[in-house]
Each structure stands twice: as structure tokens, then as C-alpha cells.
UniProtKB/Swiss-Prot annotation:
It catalyses: 1-(5-phospho-beta-D-ribosyl)-5-[(5-phospho-beta-D-ribosylamino)methylideneamino]imidazole-4-carboxamide = 5-[(5-phospho-1-deoxy-D-ribulos-1-ylimino)methylamino]-1-(5-phospho-beta-D-ribosyl)imidazole-4-carboxamide. The keyword Lipoprotein does not apply. It is an enzyme of class 5 (isomerase). Keywords: Amino-acid biosynthesis, Cytoplasm, Histidine biosynthesis, Isomerase. This is 1-(5-phosphoribosyl)-5-[(5-phosphoribosylamino)methylideneamino] imidazole-4-carboxamide isomerase. Coiled coil: none annotated. It holds the Pfam family His_biosynth. The keyword Cytoplasm applies. The active site is at 8 (proton acceptor), 129 (proton donor). Its EC number is 5.3.1.16. GO terms for biological process: L-histidine biosynthetic process; L-tryptophan biosynthetic process. GO terms for cellular component: cytoplasm. The lineage of its organism: Bacteria, Pseudomonadati, Pseudomonadota, Alphaproteobacteria, Hyphomicrobiales.
């Protein structure tokens, strides 16, 4: 299990939204590169980055901040938000990004995702953002009629590295992960699933380490880390102990 600390970028700054609302953004750090270094120093193994402006614009809008992050940390970085073409994917991977996250384009053009997986194996994840059980697109601003599992199953066997599932109704409000829908998705597909949206406390970490949740690749944490509700040392110690137990 991997705990992914999150950096959401708006106007070149690290922010957190409530319920995906760009008008409810709290600035946590004006220096994204420094935040990336801090997460690495705390012992995290990965970094999850979202270009919020890019998600709405349909193209990279915080490119300078992302490049600064890539230079500042040795940790692998996954990036979502505004990545819509094969050229975008290739450009980011060539700059040292480990994994791109395709969200809106996965709904609008699933064949592009499949082609991207062929061209860039192990470097493509699909972001499924859901509100009321339906997939949302364009930076969560538009709802579709597509179901979560229906979309995920389109990519079975394509080589998608992971599905990042975000429950928008819980994002940024520390309500706890939606375990029922997250585990239902993980049971429905063979693609590794990463939980996002609502992670609130060490209890969520402990829940993720229970046998029925170990099929998950990990979880993303934003506000709970920034607000100090989750102590990084304690969280990472729990995960380390669980890994040691599995390999014993």
C-alpha cells in the first residue's frame, strides 16, 4: 500500500479545494517545489500532482510549477489535469514524469488511452472522478451518464497502470473514504485502484490495511496531511509494519 501525498496546483500555488469547487480553494504553500521536497523528506515514496487550472482549460496551465517539482524531488511523480493528447503525454514523460493521469479524455476518447498504454507501457493511469455515482469530466465541472465500473471496464487488458478513483462528494471535506464504492470498483476490475477523496485520519489508513482492502494500490491524501490530521511518521510506520507482516 502506498500513501500518495497530493499537490494540487492553482495559479502556481499548492491549494486544496472543497468538493471540487475552484471558488473554495485554500492556499497551503506558495512554493510547490518546496512542498515536494518536504514530502520526500518526510519519507513519502510517491507524489500525486494535479494541475487544476489545466483540468478546466484542457491543456497544461501550471507547467512551470510542475517542472520545478520534478527538479526538486527524486520521488516518482504522477500528474493529472489537462493532459489530452499523445503529444502532451510524451512531452511530460520526456521531462521525467513517471505517470500521466488521463481523466476527461478517458471518457471522450477511450481509444486514445488504449493507444497511450501501447506507446507508453506502465506510464498511463486513468482518473475516474465521480459525483453521485456518475463520472464527471472537464475538471469536475460537467457530469456524464457514464457509470464508474462501466468506464473502468473499457480499459481491462489495455495495460493501464492504475485507476485513480475520486469521490468528489467527499473530496477536501475530511469525511472519510467512500469504502463501499471504492472496494466495489476494485472488485470489478483487475487494474490496481488508488483511492482518493475524503481520507481523514489514521483510521482510514488502518482500514486500508485490512485484508479486504489490500487489493488497493494505495490512497491519496491532501487536506488531512496539510491540516495535520494525519501524522506522516505514524501513517508511514503503519504501512511499513503491514508490509513487513506480509513478507514475513
Amino acid at each position: 500500500m502506498i500513501l500518495f501525498p497530493a499537490i494540487d496546483l492553482k495559479g502556481g500555488q499548492c491549494v486544496r479545494l472543497k468538493l471540487g469547487d475552484m471558488q473554495q480553494a485554500t492556499v497551503y504553500n506558495t512554493d510547490p517545489a518546496a512542498q515536494a521536497r518536504s514530502f520526500e523528506d518526510q519519507g513519502f515514496e510517491w507524489l500525486h500532482v494535479v494541475d487544476l487550472d489545466g483540468a478546466f482549460a484542457g491543456h497544461s496551465a501550471n507547467g512551470d510549477a510542475v517542472e520545478a517539482i520534478l527538479k526538486a524531488t527524486d520521488n516518482p511523480v504522477q500528474l493529472g489535469g489537462g493532459i489530452r493528447t499523445l503529444d502532451h503525454i510524451e512531452a511530460w514523460l520526456s521531462r521525467g514524469l513517471r505517470r500521466v493521469i488521463l481523466g476527461t479524455v478517458a471518457v471522450r476518447n477511450p481509444d486514445l488511452v488504449i493507444e497511450a498504454c501501447r506507446k507508453f507501457p506502465d506510464h498511463v493511469a486513468v482518473g475516474i472522478d465521480a459525483k453521485g455515482g456518475k463520472v464527471a469530466v472537464e475538471g469536475w465541472a460537467e457530469a456524464s451518464e457514464l457509470g464508474i465500473i462501466e468506464l473502468a471496464r473499457k480499459f481491462e487488458g489495455a495495460g493501464v497502470a492504475a485507476i485513480i478513483y475520486t469521490d468528489i462528494d467527499r473530496d477536501g471535506i475530511l469525511a472519510g473514504i467512500n469504502w463501499s464504492s471504492t472496494l466495489e470498483l476494485a472488485d470489478a476490475v483487475s487494474i490496481p485502484v488508488i483511492a482518493s477523496g475524503g481520507l481523514a485520519s489514521l483510521d482510514d489508513i488502518r482500514r486500508m490495511l485490512e485484508p479486504d482492502a489490500r487489493k488497493l494500490e494505495g490512497a491519496i491524501s491532501g487536506r488531512a496531511l496539510y491540516d495535520g490530521r494525519i501524522d506522516p511518521k505514524e501513517a508511514l510506520a503503519l504501512i511499513k509494519a503491514a508490509r513487513a507482516k506480509e513478507t514475513a
